[in-house]
């Protein structure tokens, strides 16, 4: 019969090995040969997926927003998003700083003062772009989000299906995926 110390040690080793064998969350690939100049211009945020408790609570009241990507003076990108909030159009600009290979950026969250990494995982530049964002919002509050950008307010069904597959490949569940409804406000078609 094994001694209590040996049983404890065996359980500890099994636990450590089990943790080491637990797969890490999937990482999004990066768009090969990303061409930043083709990524510039107007996009509509058409779909989101997240593990954030805030997102899961608020996803039913979110609506599509318009974003404009423009070059920044320091070589990064300005991402200016206009969205409906409390029946008013609100505009916010984030500075996306280059953070590695082309298509990989970082920004400081205005709400949490934490750094988030965002990467353009896939795009055809003319129809859609799939983005992946991750960061930490506080102790034990990892933040991950997949975003579907589309050049029009009506992304094709195949694009939506492709986004769903992308989001699920990153570990997001059906409950954490939402396609944002269009709104008549704040969505002018011109840039």
UniProtKB/Swiss-Prot annotation:
Primary location: endoplasmic reticulum
Localization (cell): Rough endoplasmic reticulum; Nucleus membrane; Golgi apparatus; Cytoplasm, Perinuclear region
InterPro entries listed in its UniProt record: Calycin (IPR012674), Lipocalin (IPR002345), Lipocln_cytosolic_FA-bd_dom (IPR000566)
Enzyme Commission number(s) from the entry: 5.3.99.2
Tissue-level expression: In the male reproductive system, expressed in the testis, epididymis and prostate, and secreted into the seminal fluid.
Family recorded in the similarity comment: Belongs to the calycin superfamily. Lipocalin family.
Domain notes: Forms a beta-barrel structure that accommodates hydrophobic ligands in its interior.
Subunit: Monomer.
PANTHER family the record matches: LIPOCALIN, PROSTAGLANDIN-H2 D-ISOMERASE
Protein name, UniProt field: Prostaglandin-H2 D-isomerase
Species: Bos taurus
């Amino acid at each position: 019969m094994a001694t209590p110390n040996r049983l404890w040690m065996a359980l500890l080793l099994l636990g450590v090995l089990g943790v080491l064998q637990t797969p890490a969350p999937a990482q999004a690939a990066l768009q090969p040969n990303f061409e930043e100049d083709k990524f510039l211009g107007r996009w509509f945020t058409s779909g989101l997926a997240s593990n954030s408790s805030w997102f899961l609570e608020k996803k039913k009241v979110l609506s599509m927003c318009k974003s404009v990507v423009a070059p920044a003076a320091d070589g990064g990108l300005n991402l200016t998003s206009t969205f409906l909030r409390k029946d008013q159009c609100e505009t916010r600009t984030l500075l996306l700083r280059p953070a590695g290979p082309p298509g990989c950026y970082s920004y400081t969250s205005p709400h949490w003062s934490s750094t988030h990494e965002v990467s353009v995982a896939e795009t055809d530049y003319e129809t859609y772009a799939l983005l992946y964002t991750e960061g930490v919002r506080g102790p034990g509050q990892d933040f991950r989000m997949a975003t579907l950008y589309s050049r029009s307010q009506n992304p094709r069904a195949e694009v939506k299906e492709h986004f769903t597959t992308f989001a699920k490949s990153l570990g997001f569940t059906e409950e954490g995926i939402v396609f944002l409804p269009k709104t008549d406000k704040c969505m002018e078609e011109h840039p």
